[in-house]
Amino acid sequence: MSGTFISFEGPDGAGKTSALQAITTQIKPVLGDQLVITREPGGNPISESIRAIILDRANTAMDYRTEALLYAAARRQHLAQTILPALAADKLVLCDRYVDSSVAYQGAGRQIGEDAVAQMNTFATDGLLPAVTVYFDVPAEIGLRRIQAHRDPQKVDRLDVEQAAFHDRVRAAYLRLQAAHPDRIKLIDATQKREAVVTTALTLIKQAAQNYFD
């Protein structure tokens, strides 16, 4: 495996997805087919089908452990079908969410246990972690205001509509993860202007994947 794997993480409303889109616009002309942009849950037809089940607002009866297991199943398929082949082909993979999301959202947000969810995902991924995780940090109240102000109501999912306490737990878990793994997880203050956030994220990507930009 010779490629480089970088994940993007953050609470809802942190702006990581729009930052990834802006970065893609800048580097795709340089990297061409060497660049793979993907997301979780999703990234291939099977995982996208699982995504639809997980995020469907009609699925209010979904058990929290079921939710965590579905995320892990989607992740395993995504890894096997999309990420590992891309890394084997020496590509730069930028992924919108990965294991840290499950630890934060299901482990802490759903309160089913951060360690338990981490172990579940270690099995699903065979322990594969990104070289770098770009973490977009924003207080929960700011993220939720952004969602309410800017997100298409038709695109609001089951997790977006959770109460503020849920999102506070998610952010706290992310900060614990960053403190525990500072060499991998790089924190960006996502309350800054979008241009500054994108510039910082792009700098981190270029540092982690320097050989693609030489």
UniProtKB/Swiss-Prot annotation:
NCBIfam families the record matches: DTMP_kinase
Gene Ontology biological process terms from the UniProt entry: dTDP biosynthetic process; dTTP biosynthetic process; dUDP biosynthetic process
Entry similarity comment: Belongs to the thymidylate kinase family.
Any one GO cellular component localisation term in the record: cytosol
Entry keyword set: ATP-binding, Kinase, Nucleotide biosynthesis, Nucleotide-binding, Transferase
Name listed for the protein in its UniProt record: Thymidylate kinase
Enzyme class: transferase
InterPro entries: P-loop_NTPase, Thymidylate_kin-like_dom, Thymidylate_kin_CS, Thymidylate_kinase
Residues binding ATP: 10-17
UniProt function note: Phosphorylation of dTMP to form dTDP in both de novo and salvage pathways of dTTP synthesis.
EC identifiers of the protein: 2.7.4.9
Any GO MF annotation of the entry: ATP binding
Reaction equations catalysed: dTMP + ATP = dTDP + ADP
Xref: Pfam families: Thymidylate_kin
Keyword Nucleotide-binding: yes
Organism: Levilactobacillus brevis (strain ATCC 367 / BCRC 12310 / CIP 105137 / JCM 1170 / LMG 11437 / NCIMB 947 / NCTC 947) (Lactobacillus brevis)
